[in-house]
Amino acid sequence: MTNTKVRTFSAKIAYASRELAIEERIKVKDTRDAESLEKISRDGAQILNIVAYVVLDIHNEMSEDKDYRQYVLLDKDGNKYMTGSEPFFNSFEDIWEELEDAEVPVEQRFFKIYQRPSKNYAGRNFVTCSLA
């Protein structure tokens, strides 16, 4: 009889904005050392030079929502930032695609990460972005 370990957590790369080396693929799936976009923008806007991003499909048996997505942004210094915010990612991806179409080098892609008051939930903010 085989002792099979049941995995309670998994992260799979659903999309990467560029080809990743094996070491990068392994590192980007480990988000424990990634900074939360919500936390870094809480006290004011942050300007980040994002050079790549990854969409992760997460399965977590311990979570109320067992299957969800996380978005990981990589800056020019190798720092990782993450969020699960779909509205943030929609804004980010729209800007990224425009920059790609215009062939703007990643070294020149600066994003302003900030929070705005929610129109749907009084007293709450949400993280968003714009081109810096």
Question: What is each residue range found by the language model?
Answer:
Residues R7, E86, N90, Q108-R109, ...:
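Short non-domain terminal segments
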